């Protein structure tokens, strides 16, 4: 099958690789333009652009798909289908209708729940028991298109990085299955109830609110790990917590209850396990405390 692939971050790589391994003809790869990154702020290509060039594929990085010339180039590929995985740009109606089989999206939630940009993080924050992947036929709405195939996976104690990686690989498998026998997966309209919106994550949400209890704080930590990393402030320094456990011990909100950084959250408490000081690598809590003590009774903000 002649495929246009559209994706940008690491999440999209398993699907691109799976399509290549399945023997499909990738006639073009679309990704967002290179962004300034690193200390020198030199333009850095997206993970998908980098991988596509390694594979010798034709790569396009338009800032928009609305221009007539950009749409003509897209149409000239005469693709059977466009496969989209976390591309990040709006697909106009003209683009959606160009491929013979339309545009299929790998979405990281059980639609109609968590439509939008951050379904993995929002599912963890909400305390959902399960997540998954929906292969959907794209339309002009925000993740409102008909569903072709769904697979669930338990969230358990996974953080956003681990869950996203798992979902990405499930999505790659499902997309290959759908394209192998498209007639076996007729589109099914999404339910009219149960929808929710997964707003893009804002870094301001990463400050841990211990007043909401240890259970919610632990969800917040998993939802923001590994990036941007949920954090607290100590002497005006941001200290990220990348892994933590809930403890039954009650304690004053935001106060350290011992010399091992057990943090009070009202009726329960939070025990950090993996932490990261500003500008340093992540490490076990005990390694940080050897040279950076935070004494009992400290009030964290």
UniProtKB/Swiss-Prot annotation:
InterPro entries: Fmt, Formyl_trans_C, Formyl_transf_N, Formyl_transf_N_sf, Formyl_transferase-like_C_sf, Met-tRNA-FMT_C, Met-tRNA-FMT_N. It comes from Zymomonas mobilis subsp. mobilis (strain ATCC 31821 / ZM4 / CP4). Pfam families: Formyl_trans_C, Formyl_trans_N. The keyword Transferase applies. Belongs to the Fmt family. Attaches a formyl group to the free amino group of methionyl-tRNA(fMet). The formyl group appears to play a dual role in the initiator identity of N-formylmethionyl-tRNA by promoting its recognition by IF2 and preventing the misappropriation of this tRNA by the elongation apparatus. It catalyses: L-methionyl-tRNA(fMet) + (6R)-10-formyltetrahydrofolate = N-formyl-L-methionyl-tRNA(fMet) + (6S)-5,6,7,8-tetrahydrofolate + H(+). It comes from the Bacteria. This is Methionyl-tRNA formyltransferase. (6S)-5,6,7,8-tetrahydrofolate binds at residues 109-112. Coiled coil: none annotated. Its EC number is 2.1.2.9. GO terms for cellular component: cytosol. Keywords: Protein biosynthesis, Transferase. One of its GO terms (molecular function) is methionyl-tRNA formyltransferase activity. The gene is fmt.
